[in-house]
């Protein structure tokens, strides 16, 4: 799962014509550590892009999207934010939310 910085975010997320999941997380966050393997597993199974943003390394992105808790997963479609999932999420929940965007 590729970690994006501010410069890469616009290209990989906002200019993407498909569905993109962005996981805003932090290295010190326990639930984030539990979420990461689920997202890595999903990445090999799905037809949409999954990226991560470290809120400590990219605080401007966290601020831009008002990330107040981690993990926060944001779903974008054609560059527009469509949904935010806050806290640890089961794989099935993530897939259900993505299906709603198709």
Language model regions located:
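Short, conserved catalytic or interaction motifs in soluble domains
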Residues: 34, 44, 78
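CheY-like receiver
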Residues: 12, 61-64, 97
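Structural micro-motif
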Residues: 65-74
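Non-catalytic, surface beta->alpha helical segment in thiol-disulfide oxidoreductase systems
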Residues: 77-102
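Structural signal for short hydrophobic segments within the conserved structured cores
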Residues: 2, 51, 82-85
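Conserved redox-active cysteine motifs that mediate thiol-disulfide chemistry
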Residues: 24-38
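Thiol-based oxidoreductase modules, predominantly thioredoxin-like and allied folds used
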Residues: 4, 24, 39, 43, ...
